[in-house]
């Protein structure tokens, strides 16, 4: 069946099943001594999956398998970690993607990504590690990730009642929806960069990606009745995750400026030119905008979005972005917030993630979300490569 599940007649039933499955997911403890290498291997798997044209759900499942396997077993060497990472990707592709897209071992070994690291995986090593992974997860790879929920929520992401900047109706629903989808998938990739997102259920992360995208596109209301009905989440429920995503977005913009400044400093007499970074915010079509407003009052686009979002969230608690009962919040309210007049925030162009197959992939984000939260001794139930 070629029809995606989220467009089928049983989409609601599949969504309910995934929501039930995510409640049984194990807790991520962040106990691996090689956790500091996680971002590097996330980049490796991202590059490999894009090189092999794998679907997002396969990439997200591969990284989920890697994270939780590292969390349970004592992986002590980079060779072991490379072996497990590649095996996770191949196993996830077999489970999530079409058969004709599953990469061959030779294809993986011949990529510049691995050959530049002097790494090669044999068929015997792959088979042994795949069996080890399957046993570690009790032969159950039906593990929901944010990628499994996102497309279902995107179906309700735009409506004819949406307004831009709280006043101007959207001019073209089709183009706006395309741009929101691009933004949402951008935020979905951002969630791979930090294990803090394991604090949230996958469906919460996916819904937050849609909410953050609507905030960046200045669509009002930030969270619609349709989105609340489809996801069963209120704006308050998603507030913490959305804010983390917007902080990450702000750091990406700052990194782009830093990369541009460093590049210009290295080339004498060079003129200003657009900087290219691993993650770039997406392009979206020109929307009807109010008269020009002085932007000097703002510190940075994402900071303004966070403040405006918090302000609207506070108004939502007193009477509502959404009419009717939105249900109890799982998060504590924000402190008293200063009102902020909304105005269009310029968003840099092009999101096409330019992840060049380089000799040594760079980390995509430099944001820190308080790693002290994941402190404690390293405890492991078993060694995964013990003879």
Swiss-Prot record:
UniProt lists the family membership as follows: Belongs to the cyclin family. Cyclin J subfamily.
Give the Pfam families listed for this entry: Cyclin_C (PF02984), Cyclin_N (PF00134)
Q: Which residues form the Cyclin N-terminal domain?
A: 13-142
Under SUPFAM superfamilies, the record lists: Cyclin-like (SSF47954)
| Record-linked InterPro entries | Cyclin, Cyclin-like_dom, Cyclin-like_sf, Cyclin_C-dom, Cyclin_N
Q: What is this protein called?
A: Cyclin-J-like protein
Q: For this UniProt record, give its keywords in alphabetical order, as a comma-separated list.
A: Cyclin
State which gene encodes it: Ccnjl
Q: Which residues form the signal peptide?
A: none
- Keyword Heme listed? The answer is no
């Amino acid at each position: 069946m070629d029809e995606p599940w989220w467009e089928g007649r049983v989409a609601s039933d599949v969504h309910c099943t995934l929501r039930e499955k995510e409640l049984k997911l194990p807790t991520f403890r962040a106990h691996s001594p090689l956790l500091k290498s996680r971002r590097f291997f996330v980049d490796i798997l991202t590059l490999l999956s894009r090189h092999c044209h794998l679907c997002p759900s396969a990439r997200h499942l591969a990284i989920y398998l890697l994270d939780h396997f590292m969390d349970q077993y004592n992986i002590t060497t980079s060779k072991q970690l490379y072996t497990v990472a590649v095996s996770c990707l191949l196993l996830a592709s077999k489970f999530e993607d079409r058969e004709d897209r599953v990469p061959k071992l030779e294809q993986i070994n011949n990529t510049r990504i691995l050959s530049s690291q002097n790494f090669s995986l044999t068929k015997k090593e792959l088979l042994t590690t795949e069996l080890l992974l399957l046993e570690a997860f009790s032969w159950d790879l039906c593990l929901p990730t944010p990628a499994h929920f996102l497309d279902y929520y995107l179906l309700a992401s735009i409506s004819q009642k949406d307004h831009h900047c709280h006043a101007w109706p959207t001019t073209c629903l089709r183009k706006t929806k395309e741009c929101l989808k691009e933004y949402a998938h951008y935020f979905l990739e951002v969630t791979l960069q930090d294990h803090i997102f394991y604090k949230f259920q996958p469906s919460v992360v996916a819904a937050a990606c849609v909410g953050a995208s609507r905030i960046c596109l200045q669509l009002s209301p930030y969270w619609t009745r349709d989105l609340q009905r489809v996801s069963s989440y209120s704006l308050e429920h998603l507030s913490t995750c959305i804010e983390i995503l917007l902080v990450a977005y702000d750091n990406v913009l700052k990194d782009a400026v830093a990369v541009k400044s460093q590049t210009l400093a290295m080339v004498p007499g060079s003129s200003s030119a657009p900087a290219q970074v691993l993650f770039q915010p997406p392009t979206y079509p020109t929307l009807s905008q109010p008269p020009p407003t002085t932007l000097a009052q703002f510190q940075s686009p994402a900071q303004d979005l966070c403040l405006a979002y918090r302000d609207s969230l506070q108004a939502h608690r007193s009477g509502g972005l959404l009419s009717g009962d939105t249900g109890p919040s799982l998060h504590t309210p924000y402190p008293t917030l200063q009102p902020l007049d909304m105005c269009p925030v310029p968003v840099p162009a092009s999101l096409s993630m330019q992840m060049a197959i380089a000799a040594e992939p760079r980390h995509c984000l430099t944001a820190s979300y308080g790693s002290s939260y994941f402190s404690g001794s390293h405890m492991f139930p078993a060694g995964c490569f013990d003879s």
